[in-house]
């Protein structure tokens, strides 16, 4: 990282290292968020391309990602997700993506930060019945999933709260980015 013209930050945990290099070595950084909304992924790639002075041709990848979502929706039209924060991404952004794709998200397990409020605002408008739970809350030890309506979970923590539902842990070391995150 210390010999680069700029650093590319793909995970928020790397931001502090990039800021340190910027402050100590005057190496700028660009942060790209892990997103699951295909329109936002496309916008982010376009903005990144402008910074680099290139054009990305991502239509094929976007179409594939949107086809993957459509196929899953066709196969599981009743999918109702609990999304946790112990996964590769922001649970609020992923929940917003799932709702925009036409799925239900009755529950989100996550820690609210200033970065999440843009998603929370949209979620409250599109899915006011979605509940947000904090993993830090001691009473979560007594959480009862019986009446949640959840039939699928994403994130290790969501799987913990719903042990009888299918779970995608989604927190491996190899973390898909961009459209690959949608298709996998």
Identify the meaning behind each predicted range.
Residues 1-184:
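An N-terminal assembly and electron-transfer interface module characteristic of large anaerobic redox
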